[in-house]
Amino acid sequence: MSRVAKAPVTIPAGVEVTLNEQTLTVKGSKGSLTRVINSAVNVVIEDAQVKFLPVEGVDGAWAQAGTARALVNNMVVGVSQGFVKKLKLVGVGYRAKIAGSDLDLTLGFSHPLVHKLPAGVTAECPSQTEIVLSGVDKQLIGQVAAEIRGYRPPEPYKGKGVRYDDEVVRRKEAKKK
């Protein structure tokens, strides 16, 4: 049984949460997010808290309630503080630069890569080998970061590639004669 769903989500000052049937909207200083909550979960908003209760007699309702609680908590954190994901480019000649809403990447291919940034994600390059993605939607930030990393994942022999800032690449030893 999920214990995550038992903890309510606290609504901080400056954040407004509204429920319309099964659609939950969270508005804050950084923006607003909307999500449809599973029908196996009852949502109750009271005393600056959002509580999630499973519907009786539905299989997996506790799990759905825990998932809904985690998603709504991420929405509340996103609209109040925002999320940031950092990427590092490791390799000779690996570069990144921003051109409008596009991210131009030079990753050792014969051609430059252009990654279009979706609405809701902003990128900045403090240096040519660093990318900082920020926004209110945690899932979208992670998805964009994974797509960029997927162009050239870090390889285990030299460690070259695009990696998350906190990622530790396990290195392998080269084959010996």
Curated annotation (Swiss-Prot):
Transmembrane segments: none annotated. GO terms for cellular component: cytosolic large ribosomal subunit. PROSITE patterns: RIBOSOMAL_L6_1. One of its GO terms (biological process) is cytoplasmic translation. GO terms for molecular function: rRNA binding; structural constituent of ribosome. This protein binds to the 23S rRNA, and is important in its secondary structure. It is located near the subunit interface in the base of the L7/L12 stalk, and near the tRNA binding site of the peptidyltransferase center. Belongs to the universal ribosomal protein uL6 family. HAMAP family: Ribosomal_uL6_B. Part of the 50S ribosomal subunit. This is Large ribosomal subunit protein uL6. It comes from Shewanella denitrificans (strain OS217 / ATCC BAA-1090 / DSM 15013). The gene is rplF.
